[in-house]
């Protein structure tokens, strides 16, 4: 159970409130042009996305985590190497689809935040794709289990995640419906599906 600004002590309630507020913020940053104002592909822009999404809920929004974290069979970058990893990721090229996905995979391994990494990093990925090559991922075309498996394997073999994402690319980069559905699917991958973004 994470400490939060709202004083919520029930984990199920926190999950619901976190989903609702951060989805509202995701819509807001799309509609008010905030996303467009960010530089694509930097840790700083990812931290700003994370802070925008979660600042009403967590004190650590936009801040580098202070603990080591892992998920099931996956250990993320150890704390002692995290700063160096983020500096290295910032320097990675991002001019082609393959380079952008490779950068995304490395940022996922870094997992710089205590919570909310996947949701903020997928928005960050789309910002890179949009600004660099004129595409975004239509996440509604990316199966949850296929995606999670591909991401789990991606540090060793990234061909699967590249294949999945390439097949879901669209040049409708400013389409509100694609963005809204994308947020819903992105949250669904993490187990959040109480609210539909378009209804908030």
Labelled PLM ranges:
Residues 1-200:
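FIC/Doc superfamily catalytic core
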